[in-house]
Amino acid sequence: MLKVTIIGVDLAKNVFQLHGATADGKVVFRKKLTRPLFERFMAGHHPCTVAMEASAGAHHWARKFTRYGYQVRLIAPHYVKPFLKRQKNDAADAEAIVEAALRPTMR
């Protein structure tokens, strides 16, 4: 079984899209979760790196994930956009966030 080392999260009002990957970028899971399920999933998952686009709600989640033991990376949206491979949707955004976060030179 592949070990998840990074989770890309596309934040939205009601539904969150998650993209879990290994350190070399292999996809382990793609999930779409509601707010309560998202919190429960993250509380029960082993701590790893969580990457999100920096937005108003991202700071709230970053504080919460830090308390759970996760390492959090907030990435500016204009650094994520070049990594989109297909039409913009929540799943593609979560994947692009992981791609951007895996880059060694990403701020």
Ranges and model annotations:
Residues 1-107:
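Phosphate- and other anionic-substrate recognition elements at nucleic-acid/protein interfaces
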